[in-house]
Swiss-Prot record:
SUPFAM superfamilies: Nucleic acid-binding proteins. One of its GO terms (molecular function) is exoribonuclease II activity. This is Exoribonuclease 2. It comes from Escherichia coli (strain UTI89 / UPEC). One of its GO terms (biological process) is mRNA catabolic process. Its EC number is 3.1.13.1. InterPro entries: CSD, NA-bd_OB-fold, RNase_B_OB_dom, RNase_II, RNase_II/R, RNase_II/R_CS, RNase_II/RNase_R, RNR_Ribonuclease. It catalyses: Exonucleolytic cleavage in the 3'- to 5'-direction to yield nucleoside 5'-phosphates. One of its GO terms (cellular component) is cytosol.
Length: 644
C-alpha cells in the first residue's frame, strides 16, 4: 500500500535534503578509524565499520550524524577514488590472489585477479601493476582490482628501479630504432676539425653533448665557441624516432643508470662528441668583453668538429687548483683549460653583478654494486671545472634566447616569474618583521627580485630565504620569450642538451631555420605541457628510487649511536624533516622526540620554528646532530632522533 506513494517519496526527499552532508578527503589512521578532512580547519570522525567502505585518499560526500555532541561521517558517494592504477605486492596464489598497494597508509590487501591475456602465473611476493575495478561506494560489495602488468619477482635486487618506473608509467629501456644516414638539411657546415675542442664531463659519461673552444683576442676580449651535438641532423621532424623522443621529452637519470630519450646508438655514439671522432654540431660563437658582457656579435652556425680530449671534472679542477697528478696531454689542451677558466671567472663576476648566481650545493652520488646494493654515497661539491661548463652553457643559452626572440619571436623558453603577485604584500610584511624593507610592487620586477635575492644571500644564515620560498612561483616551459627571475635574466632558452631534452631539439630546428634564413613554425603549447609533466614524473622517480636506496643504506645504522649532522629542511605540526649532510638522505623526527610534554611544544610550519616552553629550540636551516632511530623498509622512511 506504500508502494509509489507520492507523499512518502516527498517525505524521503525532504529528509534527504535536510540531512547535513560534507565533501572531503578520507584520511586513514593505523588504528582502523579515519577522518573526513573538509578543509584545513574542519574534519569529521569516520568510525571503523564505515572506513571499510572507503580508502585513504578517496574524495567522498558523507552524511554527517550528530550524537551526544559528537559528529561522525557516514560515507555516501564517491567523488574521486584515490586508487585507480597502482603498484603493489601480490599475496596468495593461484585462484585466491590479493594485492597490497605500495603506499604508507594503505595496508589492506585488495582481492584481485590477473587480466585476460596476461601470461604470468602470479605468486606470493611478486610486484604488479593493478587497476581498481570495484568500490563499495559504487554499489559493489567490496573492493576488487585487476592485475594488468607483472613487474618483477619479490627478491629481485633491482626492485627499486623497476617498481618506481612502473608506478610512474615510465619507460624501462632505450627507444628502439636506428639512424642510418644524416639528413640533407641544406646547411653549409664550417670545418672546425683543426681546432682544439674539449669536452669536460664525469668519467662515466657517454652522452657528451657539448664541446668548448676558447680563444684570446688581441684587445683583451675572449671568444668562445660552444659546439653542441646535432641529433636533428639524423632525426627528421615527425619521424618515428622524433615521435618517441617527443613522448619521453627527457633522458631519465636515476641512481645507477639512465633511460635515454634517444636510441643509445645515437645518444652514446653517433651524436656523442667523443674524443678524436669527427661529428656534426650546431655551434655558437660569442665574444666576452673584459667585464664578461656578451657582445652583440652572436653567431649561430652549423659545423663539423673533432674533440681533441675527453676531460674529467675532478682532474681539471685538481690541475687548476695545483693538486693531484693529472696533467693535460698537450700544451694546447692546457691552454684551452686556462682560457676556459678565465671565461668562467669573467662570466661568474658578470652574473654576480648583473644577474643571479645560485649558491653552490652538494651533489650526492650513489656508488652501487653489481646487484644494486649501495656500497657508498659520496657528496660531490661543485668545483671549478663544473663551473666552467655551467658558465659556458648559461652564456650559450642566453645567446639562443636572444636570437630566437629577435629573429622569430618564439622558441622553447624556461620562464620563471619570481613571486606570485597575490603574495607580494604578505612577502613584504614577512620581510619587514625581519628588518628587510621591500616595496611590494618593485619586488615583482626583475631588478627588484635580484636586489632582494642579493640581500638574502648576504644574510648570515639561509633561514629568511627558506621562509619566503613558499611565496615564489614555479618555473615554467613556454613558447613565448619571458624573464627567468631565478637566474636574474631577461630570457633563457636551452639548446645545449639536445641528446637528453626534446625542447633543446626543437630549439635546434628553430636555430637552423634562422641560420638558413627560412621561416619557422611556432611550437605548439601542448608540447610544453608534455615536457613539464615528464619532468615532474622523472623527478618523482629519481626521488622514489633515492628514498629506497637511502633506506637500504641506513638500515644497519638504525638503533645505533652513529651520529649524523643533519640540516632542518621543514617543520610541520607532526615534527621536523632533516637532510643528512654527508649523504643527502631525508629523515623525519617526530614531535615526541623533540620534547616529551606535548603542551609545552609548538611546531610551526608558518614560522619555521620549534618552540619549547615559549623559547625557540630549533629553526629551519639549523644543523643538528641526530641518530637513526628506525628505518621502515616497507615505506622507505627514515626516523631520526636528535642527540641530547
Amino acid at each position: 500500500m506504500f508502494q509509489d506513494n507520492p507523499l512518502l517519496a516527498q517525505l524521503k526527499q525532504q529528509l534527504h535534503s535536510q540531512t547535513p552532508r560534507a565533501e572531503g578527503v578520507v584520511k586513514a589512521t593505523e588504528k582502523g578509524f579515519g577522518f573526513l578532512e573538509v578543509d584545513a580547519q574542519k574534519s569529521y570522525f569516520i568510525p571503523p565499520p564505515q572506513m571499510k567502505k572507503v580508502m585513504h585518499g578517496d574524495r567522498i560526500i558523507a552524511v554527517i550524524h550528530s550524537e551526544k555532541e559528537r559528529e561522525s561521517a557516514e560515507p555516501e558517494e564517491l567523488v574521486e577514488p584515490f586508487l585507480t592504477r597502482f603498484v603493489g605486492k601480490v599475496q596468495g596464489k593461484n585462484d585466491r590472489l590479493a594485492i597490497v598497494p605500495d603506499h604508507p597508509l594503505l595496508k589492506d590487501a585488495i582481492p584481485c585477479r590477473a587480466a585476460r591475456g596476461l601470461n604470468h602465473e602470479f605468486k606470493e611476493g611478486d610486484w604488479a601493476v593493478a587497476e581498481m575495478r570495484r568500490h563499495p561506494l559504487k554499489g559493489d560489495r567490496s573492493f576488487y582490482a585487476e592485475l594488468t602488468q607483472y613487474i618483477t619477482f619479490g627478491d629481485d635486487h633491482f626492485v627499486p628501479w623497476w617498481v618506481t618506473l612502473a608506478r610512474h608509467n615510465l619507460e624501462k629501456e632505450a627507444p628502439d630504432g636506428v639512424a642510418t644516414e644524416m639528413l640533407d638539411e641544406g646547411l653549409v657546415r664550417e670545418d672546425l676539425t683543426a681546432l682544439d675542442f674539449v669536452t669536460i664531463d664525469s668519467a662515466s659519461t657517454e652522452d657528451m653533448d657539448d664541446a668548448l673552444f676558447a680563444k684570446a683576442l688581441p684587445d683583451g676580449k675572449l671568444q668562445l665557441i660552444v659546439a653542441i651535438a646535432d641529433p636533428t641532423a639524423w632525426i627528421a621532424e615527425g619521424s618515428k624516432l622524433d615521435k618517441a623522443a617527443k613522448i619521453r621529452a627527457f633522458t631519465n637519470y636515476l641512481p645507477g643508470f639512465n633511460i635515454p630519450m634517444l636510441p643509445r646508438e645515437l645518444s652514446d655514439d653517433l651524436c656523442s662528441l667523443r674524443a678524436n671522432e669527427v661529428r656534426p654540431v650546431l655551434a655558437c660563437r660569442m665574444t666576452f668583453s673584459t667585464d664578461g658582457t656578451i657582445e652583440d656579435n652572436i653567431e649561430f652556425f652549423a659545423a663539423t668538429i673533432e674533440s681533441k680530449a675527453k676531460l674529467v671534472y675532478d682532474q681539471v679542477s685538481d690541475w687548476l687548483e695545483n693538486t693531484g697528478d693529472w696533467q693535460p696531454e698537450s700544451e694546447a689542451i692546457a691552454e684551452q683549460v686556462r682560457l676556459l677558466a678565465q671565461i668562467c671567472q669573467r662570466r661568474g663576476e658578470w652574473r654576480h653583478n648583473h644577474a643571479l648566481v645560485f649558491k653552490d650545493r652538494l651533489d650526492y652520488r650513489f656508488i652501487l654494486g653489481e646487484k644494486g646494493e649501495v656500497l657508498d654515497i659520496v657528496a660531490e661539491p661543485r668545483r671549478i671545472a663544473n663551473r666552467i661548463v655551467e658558465e659556458a652553457m648559461i652564456a650559450a643559452n642566453i645567446c639562443a634566447a636572444r636570437v630566437l626572440r629577435d629573429k622569430l619571436g618564439f622558441g622553447i623558453y624556461n620562464v620563471h616569474m619570481g613571486f606570485d603577485p597575490a603574495n607580494a604584500d604578505a612577502l613584504a610584511a614577512l620581510l619587514k618583521t625581519h628588518g628587510l624593507h621591500v616595496d611590494a610592487e618593485e619586488v615583482l620586477t626583475l631588478d627588484g627580485f635580484c636586489k632582494l635575492r642579493r640581500e638574502l644571500d648576504a644574510q648570515p644564515t639561509g633561514f629568511l630565504d627558506s621562509r619566503i620560498r613558499r611565496f615564489q612561483s614555479f618555473a615554467e616551459i613556454s613558447t613565448e620569450p619571458g624573464p627567468h627571475f631565478g637566474l636574474g635574466l631577461e630570457a633563457y632558452a636551452t639548446w645545449t642538451s639536445p641528446i637528453r631534452k626534446y625542447g633543446d631539439m626543437i630549439n635546434h630546428r628553430l636555430l637552423k631555420a634562422v641560420i638558413k634564413g627560412e621561416t619557422a613554425t611556432r611550437p605548439q603549447d601542448e608540447i610544453t605541457v608534455q615536457m613539464a609533466e615528464r619532468r615532474r614524473l622523472n623527478r618523482m622517480a629519481e626521488r622514489d628510487v633515492g628514498d629506497w636506496l637511502y633506506a637500504r643504506f641506513l638500515k644497519d645504522k638504525a638503533g645505533t649511536d652513529t651520529r649524523f649532522a643533519a640540516e632542518i629542511v621543514d617543520i610541520s605540526r607532526g615534527g621536523m624533516r632533516v637532510r643528512l649532510v654527508d649523504n643527502g638522505a631525508i629523515a623525519f623526527i617526530p614531535a615526541p622526540f623533540l620534547h616529551a610534554v606535548r603542551d609545552e611544544l609548538v611546531c610551526s610550519q608558518e614560522n619555521g620554528t620549534v618552540q619549547i616552553k615559549g623559547e625557540t629550540a630549533y629553526k629551519v636551516t639549523d644543523v643538528i646532530d641526530v641518530t637513526i632511530a628506525e628505518v621502515r623498509m616497507e615505506t622507505r622512511s627514515i626516523i631520526a632522533r636528535p642527540v641530547a
